[in-house]
Each structure stands twice: as C-alpha cells, then as structure tokens.
C-alpha cells in the first residue's frame, strides 16, 4: 500500500502516524506515540481497527532525548510490512515571514527554518530533527513542512504588527500566531458538520499544555492570542502567556539574570507549573486540594475569559465557541468554568451534556453554541503532504 508518514516531534514526546493513500482519499493505518522521553518512555501504537501493535515501557537511559527517540521509532517502523512510503509530512511550529503555506523541504528550506529556532526554542529544534534524520536515511522520499503560523498569515498588517518602528515589521517582528494546523482542521470540520456555525463568528480554544485561542469568521483567522512567539497569550503548562515586556527588562537589569536564564524561566518554569509550584499538568492540579493548585487554575480560567472577550470584540460578537486539544476535549471542569466566563456573551452551558462529553454542550436556547471537537493535526498534515506530492 502506498503510504504517508506524518511526524509531530516535541521535547518530551514523539507522535507519528501512517496514512494509506487510497482512491477515496487518506486512510489512517497506524497511530503511534513515544512519550515520557528521558523520564518514563513508553512506545504505544495501534492499528486502524484498534488492534494494539506495541505497548512497551523503555529504559529512560536508552531514550534520554529526542534523537534516541527517533532511533527507536525508526527501528520499530522498519518492522512494519506492506507500506510503500511515498512522502513524509512534518509539523513545524514557526514558518517565519517566508512560509505562508506548506512547502516541499529542500536544503535551502531547512536552513531557513533553522534560522527561526530562537523564535520557537521549545519546538523548532525538535521539529527539524526528524527532517534531518529522514534526509539521511531516506534521501529519495520527499518531505513536506506544514506550519503552525501559516493559517494566520492572511490577516491585515495592522492586525499583525506591533507598535514599533516599521523597520522591525519588515524584518519579521510581527504577530504570527500559532496552533494554525489545529485551527485549520477545526475550521474544515465545522464546515462539514455545522456549516451554519462555520459561516459565523467562532472562537476556537486550543487548550492543552500549549494553549491559545483563535477568532474565526467564515472559517478564516481574524485574530489570535499568540504573537511573535509561542510564549504569548494564555498561560500554559510551563509558559506564562501574556507578559508586560517591562518584566523581562526588570529581570535582565534589576535582577541581573542572563538572557538564557530568562529564556529558561519563560519557557520551562512559568505557567501552571510556576504558579502552582506543583505541576504543569491540569489533570494533576484539578485532583489536588493544595490551594496553590486552585490559584493556578483560577488564573488560567480568568485569562481564558479575558482573551475570549478580546476575540469576541474582534469578531463583532460571537455565535459559537469550540473547545479542542487535550484540556479542551477532556476536562469538563475547565470547560464549565470557561463557559461561565462567556455567560455575558449569551453562552448557557448544559452541565449534563458537558459532564457526558457531548459534542454540543450548550443548552438548546443558548445564544452562543458551545461545541467540543477533537482536533486532528496529523490528518491535516497528511492532506497537505498528499496535495503537494501529487502536484509535483
């Protein structure tokens, strides 16, 4: 079977999926994840019919980092039979000012993407590592990069810019926005299952270890909460979200911190983890009776409500609100509390539907429809990859 491999590489996990190329379109064949890199690594994979292919705990010393995780994944993939690999698609967080749509990866493209590593140090190096590996071991297999920033690139300049001298915008200092692959998938899925909603004013909340929200009008990005980097906007697992730049100046000058120390603070020691002093995992915080956990959750929900108001203003009102990603799809308590913050816009939560994990969790008469919709970034990447190799 002709197939595509889709890779989504992070610092602590590696997700990869195989899609068969059929006459009717793409058919998911294998879904795999190697998580707990360097701590409690485990490789799990299932076939399309749900059959477990592997569920193996690995020695942490054998998988201390992403390069070793990639080697483990490569070796396991080599045991699979019946797939004729036609292309590899990758999630790449930052496309900078140059890439506004998915692109076939060549050496010059890879070099350009590497130049954006300082803009996404938590993600970009990990995104590029499997590309380099595949270039070495499968040089004849085309690779495609799909960017989290691309979905937002159609916005107006006055929306994208910062109030800095124009030369900075021309040098690429602008509000890029992220999680675009997820938002693109949700926008397309809404057109399929709720076309009247898709044509309206929609806020999508991608709430996971990384979190942001996006305002959609007729399926297009109008405004989003993240900006130049994936530090901005909502508080996240280990990132602070919106922060007065004066705080950074204070840390550098008055506190005497180095730029690297500030970067480590903002990317690894802030957010839910920093506020609570307990964990970056919302599930753990919700299960804790420690007041610091409640404090972190309160802050997260407060910021969600504030940013939803900003996005509703950008849309001129609100017709629907969609929860997606790890927290959005799975945490009924967080959905309930965020929905409370939307009551002034006309959102009325149906608690029973919310607790049951229904796809629509608003009451029948709610002015704002509340939806829960699983995202599928890997499928979106596979679609773009297939389109590009067919157009060659």
UniProtKB/Swiss-Prot annotation:
Active site: residue positions: 148 (proton donor/acceptor)
InterPro entries named in the record: Ac/propionate_kinase, Aliphatic_acid_kin_short-chain, Aliphatic_acid_kinase_CS, ATPase_NBD
Cofactor entry: Mg(2+); Mn(2+)
GO molecular function term, any single one: ATP binding
Subcellular location: Cytoplasm
Positions of the record's site feature: Transition state stabilizer: 179, 239
Keywords carried by this UniProt record: ATP-binding, Cytoplasm, Kinase, Magnesium, Metal-binding, Nucleotide-binding, Plasmid, Transferase
Binding-site residues, Mg(2+): 8, 377
Catalytic activity: acetate + ATP = acetyl phosphate + ADP
Matching CDD domains: ASKHA_NBD_AcK_PK
Transmembrane segments: none
Binding site for substrate: 91
Enzyme class: transferase
Keyword Ribosomal protein annotated: no
Cofactor note: Mg(2+). Can also accept Mn(2+).
GO cellular component: a single term: cytosol
Domain of life: Bacteria
Chain sites annotated for binding ATP: 15, 206-210, 281-283, 326-330
Function text: Catalyzes the formation of acetyl phosphate from acetate and ATP. Can also catalyze the reverse reaction.
Quaternary organization: Homodimer.
HAMAP family: Acetate_kinase
Name of the protein in question: Acetate kinase
Organism per entry: Rhizobium meliloti (strain 1021)
Gene this protein is translated from: ackA
